[in-house]
Design a protein with these regions (language model features):
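Well-ordered, non-membrane alpha-helical segments in soluble/globular domains
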Residues: 80-88, 121-132
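Secreted/periplasmic serine-hydrolase-like ester/acetyl group-modifying domain
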Residues: 1-97, 193
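Active-site segments of SGNH/GDSL-like serine hydrolases
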Residues: 94-119, 145, 151
Length: 196
């Protein structure tokens, strides 16, 4: 009886593991990040995290990461950095191909901006934006700064919520949602900066 019972138990455990694997694969398929043909990330991974753990975990993780990264006292904006040189070269190549360019500064939800301020880097952030602005002026390009303290950037955070509809514009401080992206595109394409 022991051997027969052991075989039945082994079979049941194998069936259970197979079923669990199948469920895991199905769930993963629906909640992985996916880029559309035009490069849009639909944020499906965020849906899963918010439903299971709430927005708080995303915000806490980003805040810890930012605080650690911005603690480096050597962080200084350099006009002659390789980053600015690469931007200039890239813009030159686009100009040679007659490709129209619009520059923008990403929106950051207020907790991100708070970490910049608390790290004593607000001046460096403003200097970086000034240098980007100088590049835009030099090349006669449009520049939109979505990081300013607007109604959207300062929108209250529903940290404890597990309902993805509660934070309409951001998944976490550095990643904005499609709603925000659509408003940004409207602003850049047709000059419509109105919040609907």
């Amino acid at each position: 009886h022991w051997i027969q019972g052991k075989e039945q138990l082994s079979f049941l455990l194998s069936q259970s593991a197979l079923f669990d694997t199948f469920l895991t694969l199905i769930q993963q398929k629906s909640d992985v990040n996916a880029l559309s043909e035009n490069g849009f990330n639909d944020g499906r991974l965020y849906h899963h995290i918010v439903r299971s753990e709430g927005f708080a975990v995303l915000y806490q993780q980003k805040q810890q990461e930012l605080t650690a990264r911005l603690a480096n006292s050597a962080l200084k904006v350099q006009a002659d950095s390789t980053g600015f040189q690469a931007l200039e070269l890239f813009l030159q190549l686009l100009a040679e191909q007659d490709i129209e360019v619009t520059l923008f500064v990403n929106p950051y939800h207020y907790p991100y901006l708070d970490v910049i301020q608390q790290s004593g880097l607000q001046g460096e952030f403003e200097r970086w934006k000034d240098l980007i602005s100088a590049v835009a002026q030099k090349r006669q390009l449009s520049l939109y700064d979505f990081s300013i303290a607007s109604e959207l950037v300062m929108a209250p955070l529903q940290e404890s919520s597990r309902d993805i509809r509660d934070n309409k514009y951001f998944w976490e401080p550095a990643h904005y949602r499609q709603t925000m992206g659509t408003l940004m595109l409207d602003a850049m394409q047709v000059g419509n900066c109105q919040v609907q």
